[in-house]
Amino acid sequence: MKTDTPSLETPQAARLRRRQLIRQLLERDKTPLAILFMAAVVGTLVGLAAVAFDKGVAWLQNQRMGALVHTADNYPLLLTVAFLCSAVLAMFGYFLVRKYAPEAGGSGIPEIEGALEDQRPVRWWRVLPVKFFGGLGTLGGGMVLGREGPTVQIGGNIGRMVLDVFRLKGDEARHTLLATGAAAGLAAAFNAPLAGILFIIEEMRPQFRYTLISIKAVFIGVIMSTIMYRIFNHEVALIDVGKLSDAPLNTLWLYLILGIIFGIFGPIFNKWVLGMQDLLHRVHGGNITKWVLMGGAIGGLCGLLGFVAPATSGGGFNLIPIATAGNFSMGMLVFIFVARVITTLLCFSSGAPGGIFAPMLALGTVLGTAFGMVAVELFPQYHLEAGTFAIAGMGALLAASIRAPLTGIILVLEMTDNYQLILPMIITGLGATLLAQFTGGKPLYSAILARTLAKQEAEQLARSKAASARENT
């Protein structure tokens, strides 16, 4: 009997171990329903906020254009009104940010990344109103900014607000709802749910804690925010460029060359952004009055450009279909590209509340169209369509600048509904990303966050030294 005991106990022990393993797996997949419910609440609120923000920007832009119509007979007065309307709106946005919530300036995405790393505070009670109304001022004034920055930061702050209001405890709940709000914000800004999910997983991969709980919550939040957007808008593609032809296999090497061009330009563009930040900081020196006046001058310039050369101002969504259709000459494309590079640098680097996704999409479209027009002339045997290079270029600058090729590709596909171009877009985006990484370029948002944290550390050190000096006296 003693010799039989081990042979009888071994299967029993194995069965117990299997049962215990299955029990552990099932328990691990038990997501707290409270977090999932809160994720749905966050997604709904973020979607409504994004819709309100979008409608508010459109209303302000229409009012500004209406004011210009009333002065159309007097050209000098028309230019003056164009400058002043945009300048006043921009100054309003700059003043709110500098006076009440400096962390609401710029894109806001680095702030969310810092919060996910527990290195930046989330003061939703002041960021939400300042980012919302400040962004209305700058974007409504026609500045070259995108709405995705405000909606992502607003979304993350709404996630933290819901956490505090419902008094949920734990780091996992805080981190999950913050990420859920950010993803929902991007999805609602572009009517691109899959891009919102990928944005959190790819762009915020160093900060995002990938767990069963967090990914389920992000999915739910993105679904709800997209539903809210489509209830108040439409279910079609955000940018209507029509159905473009597919790229033949023997032309794919051209898209790799286009990716190389963006891989060179992306890191250079990032350096220009950071350099312009330093230059403009030397101009205002941290003084609120100088900062607001400088912002008004930049906003007024965008207002003038919006009247004289509309393609060079605004976020760029109106420009993309026109450029993709080939309605600009090569000389005009070069002018638009150079002008928009300058205005993007001025607007974004000045600390205005607004994003850079949309301006970069427009820049990528213009450069891609120009490349496509050259390719059409050089290789007539391929029967190329310049618009396909425009679509490929849209996401390539994002890929090279913020180092998120998947997000850029899926975002453009969802916005334009040209899924047949996924292969050339992958080639262009991957080429741009690899070359940008090979040349040592730093991702834009990571570089901005590093600057913010260095400034925060310097301020804390200065306060500590001042406190020590007071104690010694």
Curated annotation (Swiss-Prot):
Q: Where is this site: Mediates proton transfer from the protein to the inner aqueous phase?
A: 203
Cleaved signal peptide residues: none
Asked if the keyword Transmembrane belongs to this entry, the reply reads yes
- Residues forming the motif Selectivity filter part_3 are 355-359
Q: Which UniProt keywords apply?
A: Antiport, Cell inner membrane, Cell membrane, Chloride, Ion transport, Membrane, Transmembrane, Transmembrane helix, Transport
Q: What is its main location?
A: membrane
Q: Which residues lie on this side of the membrane: Periplasmic?
A: 70-76, 233-252, 310-329, 377-386
Where does the chain enter the bilayer but not traverse it?
109-116, 177-189, 193-201, 387-401, 402-404, 405-416, 417-421
Where, by residue number, does the polypeptide cross the bilayer? Answer: 33-69, 77-100, 124-141, 148-166, 215-232, 253-281, 288-309, 330-349, 355-376, 422-438
* Listed GO CC annotations: plasma membrane
Where is the motif Selectivity filter part_1 annotated in this sequence? 106-110
Q: Which reaction does it catalyse?
A: 2 chloride(in) + H(+)(out) = 2 chloride(out) + H(+)(in)
Cytoplasmic topological domain ranges are 1-32, 117-123, 167-176, 202-214, 282-287, 439-473
Q: Where does chloride bind?
A: 107, 356-357, 445
Location of the motif Selectivity filter part_2: 146-150
Q: By its UniProt entry, which InterPro entries does this protein fall under?
A: Cl-channel_ClcA (IPR023861), Cl-channel_core (IPR014743), ClC (IPR001807)
Where does this polypeptide localize?
Cell inner membrane
Question: How the protein sits in the membrane?
Answer: Multi-pass membrane protein
* Site residues (Mediates proton transfer from the outer aqueous phase to the interior of the protein), renumbered to this chain: 148
* Superkingdom: Bacteria
Q: What does this protein do?
A: Proton-coupled chloride transporter. Functions as antiport system and exchanges two chloride ions for 1 proton. Probably acts as an electrical shunt for an outwardly-directed proton pump that is linked to amino acid decarboxylation, as part of the extreme acid resistance (XAR) response.
What is said about its interaction partners and assembly? Answer: Homodimer.
Q: Which PANTHER family match?
A: CHLORIDE CHANNEL PROTEIN
**What is the protein name stated in its UniProt record?**
H(+)/Cl(-) exchange transporter ClcA
Q: Which organism is it from?
A: Escherichia coli O1:K1 / APEC
Lineage of producing organism:
Bacteria, Pseudomonadati, Pseudomonadota, Gammaproteobacteria, Enterobacterales
